[in-house]
Swiss-Prot record:
Broad class of where this protein is predominantly found: membrane
Transmembrane segments: 31-51, 64-84, 119-139, 155-175, 183-203, 221-241, 265-285, 298-318, 355-375, 381-401, 412-432, 437-457
The protein, known as: Probable potassium transport system protein Kup 4
Any Gene Ontology CC annotation: plasma membrane
Organism: Bradyrhizobium sp. (strain BTAi1 / ATCC BAA-1182)
Length: 641
């Protein structure tokens, strides 16, 4: 009884993230409208290609019973995976208001990458890396499926669909550097119009054949799987496309909070999707067999071109949400120490989450356009879609089980029961998507595996750098003794030494004195730490320790979603000498050169060149930490690994 009561209290207690709309003083219904434009682009445009893909998996011919079984699978996939798993459980696993698989990984303590936490870290990193894999396919399949709607009216435009898609994608990626601050406010209303249109179109199909509503009975889905044999797995692979955008609910939780995201899902998105799929199924039953896309065939001929235009806008919005999510996930991975520092530009001075990461943008553009040209159509591309995100959803469930046990302290039986239900569904879809590997499913898996390799290589290399610096540094006691004895000449001014190490006297400071023969009158040895929490309160941000006359050791902590401004943060530090002149301080940083040590480990032989390349091309400290470039001195240093 006590355990049941505790679970009830957990379900009824608001999370930190539910206060997001309250903190911004934005009414929940307006926040829900905003969520339509950011969170539900991918899920909302899935009716463009999902049922078409399923129809192809069945060979284009099916009975009324099989059509109802497929619709029932779509209905209950949306209910179990999105309505229950993500809306009720996964979104409860907020990391101080932030969501996403990397935030979940940090919540369960996997970012330490030690002991058994390594397994959880691998799950989180692999899940995040695979999202990049499907992220390069989403814009391609969405834009192609929208443009292919013109084939319903005339086949003469078919040769121009792929070139037009490539042109649109080039403009789309090229425009990312300008941000979406000015037009982003229109995303929500446009997607609201989209959902209303697909709901009305679905209703027109249902009116012709109301019997499709019986698909709400899950026995239709169970019966279909029981009697479809091996073809059922192929159909499941197509059905999965209706939820490929499910991770966005969790990833964008920090922007809107669970409340508005749930409100828009239950009130608008879910009913519209169900009506659209039901209407398309009614059309399939009516015709018995169908060629082309049932989504556009629901529309009267006079409305196809306007619908194609609206679908084009909706798919661009869906692609925008994928790109924005990739930028945000890249920043999280950087702050948590899993990726090198990339140049990040804030594209809005009002909305924190609107950022632009050039290297990610151009890499995704090249991959997306290459995929569009290679596959040429949405039906061929559907074979490559879903393999990566199905793996991510499976890994999310595994991490969710860990959160149930470690964070929420749930009983083992309850955790197994709930996570086990989700695992059954996830494993089923995972197995179905494995059948797509030969049809192109290898592509997002390979792309994700490459990102995963880069993440592990970077983290291993950075840990090796810290260990090498710690072993090579001189004893700080001798340096402090020389300072106390007046053996180190002091010159006027303030110097701030940026260091990765945690020693009280960092090697950079000692090397500076050794080569220059003097030290500034006021010195700050500064280490920047990125914590597993998304944000750090100002009163907890800095730790200050005076270690010698005129020398302070400062440790500054930031959350993994924060953009550090060191100059501004240092001015708020308490415990420093008031005479320190931060406005004219000189910042000292290193520009390290990575080389292989003779007889080094396997890491140096085959991964060191990769790490050295990443290290060499990482963003400079002056750019990452908003330092004044005319007051930064970089010192070259060779590090053997």
């Amino acid at each position: 009884m006590l355990r049941a009561t505790a679970l009830h209290e957990w379900l009824m207690t608001p999370t930190v993230a539910q206060d997001v709309s309250t903190r911004t003083r934005e009414p929940q219904h307006w926040a829900a409208l905003g969520a339509l434009g950011i969170v539900y682009g991918d899920l909302g445009t899935s009716p463009l290609y999902t049922l078409q893909t399923v129809v192809q998996a069945t060979g284009g011919h099916f009975t009324t019973a099989s059509a109802l079984g497929i619709l029932s699978l779509l209905v209950w996939t949306l209910i179990i995976t999105i309505s229950i798993k993500y809306c009720l459980f996964v979104m409860r696993a907020d990391n101080h208001g932030e969501g996403g698989i990397l935030a979940l990984m940090s919540l369960v303590g996997a970012n330490r990458f030690k002991g058994t936490a390594k397994i959880l870290a691998v799950m989180g990193l692999l899940g995040a890396a695979l999202l990049y894999g499907d992220g390069v396919i989403t814009p391609a399949i969405s834009v192609l499926s929208a443009l292919e709607g013109v084939n319903v009216v005339t086949g003469s435009l078919k040769p121009f669909v792929m070139p037009a898609a490539v042109a649109i994608l080039i403009v789309f990626f090229a425009a990312q550097r300008f941000g979406t601050a000015r037009i982003g406010a229109a995303f929500g209303p446009i997607m609201l119009l989209w959902f209303l249109v697909i709901a009305v179109l679905g209703l027109t199909g249902i009116v012709r054949n109301p019997s499709v509503l019986t698909a709400l009975d899950p026995r239709h889905a169970i019966g279909f799987l029981a009697h479809s044999g091996g073809n059922g797995m192929l159909v499941l692979g197509g059905v999965f496309l209706c939820i490929t955008g499910g991770e966005a609910l969790y990833a964008d939780m920090g922007h809107f909070g669970p409340g508005p995201i749930r409100l828009s899902w239950y009130a608008i998105v879910l009913p519209s999707l169900l009506l659209s799929y039901a209407g398309q199924t009614a059309l399939l039953i009516q015709k018995g067999t169908i060629e082309g896309n049932p989504f556009f065939q629901l529309c009267p001929t006079w409305g196809v071109y306007p619908l194609v235009f609206l679908a084009m806008i909706a798919t661009i919005i869906a692609s925008q949400s994928i790109i924005t999510g990739s930028f945000s996930m890249t920043r999280q991975a950087m702050q948590l120490g899993w990726l090198p520092g990339f140049h990040i530009r804030q594209t809005s001075d009002k909305v924190y989450g609107q950022i632009y990461v050039p290297v990610v943008n151009w890499m995704m553009m090249v991959a997306t356009i290459g995929i569009t040209i290679a596959f040429g159509s949405s039906d061929r591309l559907a074979g490559a879609y879903g393999t990566a995100v199905s793996t991510t959803m499976l890994l999310t469930t595994c991490l969710l089980f860990t959160a149930m046990r470690k964070t929420w302290r749930w009983p083992l039986a309850v955790s197994i029961l709930i996570a086990g239900l989700f695992l059954i569904v996830d494993v089923g879809f995972f197995g179905a998507n494995l059948l797509k590997i030969a049809e192109g499913g290898w592509l997002p898996l390979t792309f994700g595996a490459l990102v995963f390799f880069l993440m592990l290589t970077w983290r291993s290399g950075i840990d090796a750098v810290r260990e090498s610096l710690a072993q090579a540094s001189e004893a700080p006691e001798r340096f402090v003794a020389d300072l106390a004895a007046g053996k180190v000449p002091r010159v006027p001014g303030t110097a701030i030494f940026l260091t990765r190490t945690y020693q009280k006297i960092p090697p950079l400071l000692i090397d500076h004195v050794k080569h220059m023969g003097a030290l500034h009158q006021s010195v700050i040895a500064l280490t920047i730490l990125f914590e597993e929490s998304p944000r750090i309160d100002d009163e907890e941000r800095c730790g200050v320790e005076k270690i010698a006359d005129g020398i302070w050791r400062v440790t500054m902590r930031f959350g993994f979603v924060e953009i550090p401004d060191l100059t501004a943060a240092l001015k708020r530090v308490k415990g420093l000498d008031p005479s320190i002149d931060l406005d004219h301080a000189i910042y000292f940083a290193t520009r390290d050169i990575i080389v292989a040590r003779a007889g080094s480990s396997l890491f140096a032989h085959w991964r060191l060149p990769v790490f050295a390349f990443l290290y060499r091309n990482a963003v400079k400290v002056v750019d990452r930490f908003s330092l004044p470039p005319d007051r930064v001195v970089e010192i070259a240093r060779q590090i053997e690994l």
